[in-house]
């Protein structure tokens, strides 16, 4: 089994964890509808890069 040579200091531990933070997802605005969506994903209306790629589901308003 691997055994550490010396105890890891809090500084070294923090430096190792410095890249683990979550980042906000990059957002884009659909040019045709103005909807905000994640990059490389279709908008809620079914548009991607200015073209409608799928039909949006009709929502029942009750």
UniProtKB/Swiss-Prot annotation:
Transmembrane segments: none annotated. It comes from Thioalkalivibrio sulfidiphilus (strain HL-EbGR7). It comes from the Bacteria. The keyword Ribosomal protein applies. Belongs to the bacterial ribosomal protein bL32 family. This is Large ribosomal subunit protein bL32. GO terms for cellular component: large ribosomal subunit. Keywords: Ribonucleoprotein, Ribosomal protein. GO terms for molecular function: structural constituent of ribosome. InterPro entries: Ribosomal_bL32, Ribosomal_bL32_bact, Ribosomal_zn-bd. One of its GO terms (biological process) is translation. Residues 28-62 are annotated as: Disordered. SUPFAM superfamilies: Zn-binding ribosomal proteins (SSF57829). Pfam families: Ribosomal_L32p.
